[in-house]
Amino acid sequence: MRDKISESTQKIFHAVWERIAPFHEMIQSRPAVLSYSGGKDSSILLHFYFWLWIEKKIPAPCIYHLDHSIRFNLEQEKKIFEYADSTFPFSKIFKKKNIPALSRRLGKTLEETGRAFRYKDLKKISDQYEGYIVTGHHSSDYLETILLNLIRGGGWNSLRTLGWYEKNRFRPLFAFSQEEIETILQSEFWKIFEDESNNSDEYLRNRIRSYIIPLLLREGANPDRIYKNFHRIEKPVSKIFSKKNSDHKIPSFLKIDIWVLNDLSQRERKFFIDRYLRSLNLYPTTRNFFRDLTDLLQKENSFSLENKETWFWKSTSSDLYLIPKNSPCLREFRFEPKEMVLKWNGNQKKIPPDLIPDLCPAGAKIRKNGMSIEISEILRQKEIPVPVRKMLPILRGERKVDVICLSLWDPKIGDIVADREVEILPDFQEPGV
């Protein structure tokens, strides 16, 4: 027998659906894996997705539940399964793990162990379904987590925890105000299965929830407003969508103004660089790597630094370049001889039939302004990053370099043409690249 959803709750659900518009493409195209505990928050989450499915806005989700073996209540776990099975016509994955025993073996808290196991399991399932994970965190949970992290010695990132979408985990309850959550809980008569461990003062989070949060609320703290101060709702980067649904082009590189970086504090600088990396669909820098990068920036010399995903390059006078290691500018060009089209770095150029594309060999020169100039010197002056230089195409004719194809690196930069008449046809962008 399916639960009823009142008109007032449906109005809230509709308003929330409009608020999460930046995520519509993801929600409509990929199945959700719902992390369901049986408690109040996950019950709202489950019914919200049930309503979205009834309204034909989303594909059928999958319900995931983990018995942590903390309740020692087999009867309640059985009731949770029976309720979910009889109420929601979705696929279900119910698992049991002895989290207390695993916690003792790993030397971690019950909360840390349970969270790590759940997310590892959820990741496997979401990968299998080619979907995304959904959890029931909301702004009060965020306030608890801030305090928990600060007590444990957390820094600036403690304020930015629990984002709208990160690591393929979506948290739509942040779109509900605390007042709306209370309204739903008072209006509906859905079955709630509270974990008895939530009432135990044995756990730090519970003590924060029971004693500190009420005090802050009485003093005027607003969890919704605090969360919005540190989080913006933004359209996710393209890799969360299936390839057929994504036409977003990720840049082959990004450049950060060095004067802007120099005016920032260490924390602001890391946040700024990590935001640029996110735009490239890359992970943020680690603390140790960022320290090494900062040391090099302060020396004001040219450098090239890399981690697993990215090249960080800067000349003495240039801005800081961020180049993904899978960037098209680090791959060899493609040449289509029938059309005489040269393609590289997401750009393309039609070339005259008497020229041949090639890579620049060491020591190669080009005749310019009556002088024979080393191409490496030209690339240095033009501030072409070192990792890119060996892949930048040139055009040869009569055994000499006639053109350095700088426009394929950056269309705003003109090609370098040797001192002889060479017909260079206009550049054009490759459609859809």
UniProtKB/Swiss-Prot annotation:
Which residue spans traverse the membrane?
none
What keywords are annotated for this sequence in UniProt? Answer: ATP-binding, Cytoplasm, Ligase, Nucleotide-binding, tRNA processing
A GO BP term here is: tRNA modification
GO MF terms here are: ATP binding; tRNA(Ile)-lysidine synthase activity
Q: What is its EC number?
A: 6.3.4.19
Any idea which positions bind ATP? 37-42
Which Pfam families does UniProt cross-reference here? ATP_bind_3 (PF01171)
Q: Which domain of life is it from?
A: Bacteria
Catalytic activity, per the record?
cytidine(34) in tRNA(Ile2) + L-lysine + ATP = lysidine(34) in tRNA(Ile2) + AMP + diphosphate + H(+)
Keyword Transmembrane part of the UniProt annotation: no
Q: Where in the cell is it found?
A: Cytoplasm
Any one of the GO CC terms: cytoplasm
The cross-references to CDD domains, in alphabetical order and at most eight, read: TilS_N
Please name the SUPFAM superfamilies in this protein's record. Adenine nucleotide alpha hydrolases-like
InterPro entries, alphabetically?
A: Rossmann-like_a/b/a_fold (IPR014729), TilS/TtcA_N (IPR011063), tRNA_Ile_lys_synt (IPR012094), tRNA_Ile_lys_synt_N (IPR012795)
Q: What does this protein do?
A: Ligates lysine onto the cytidine present at position 34 of the AUA codon-specific tRNA(Ile) that contains the anticodon CAU, in an ATP-dependent manner. Cytidine is converted to lysidine, thus changing the amino acid specificity of the tRNA from methionine to isoleucine.
Q: Which family does it belong to?
A: Belongs to the tRNA(Ile)-lysidine synthase family.
Q: Which HAMAP family match?
A: tRNA_Ile_lys_synt (MF_01161)
About its domains, the entry says:
The N-terminal region contains the highly conserved SGGXDS motif, predicted to be a P-loop motif involved in ATP binding.
Query: What is this protein called in UniProt?
Result: tRNA(Ile)-lysidine synthase
The species this protein belongs to is Leptospira interrogans serogroup Icterohaemorrhagiae serovar copenhageni (strain Fiocruz L1-130)
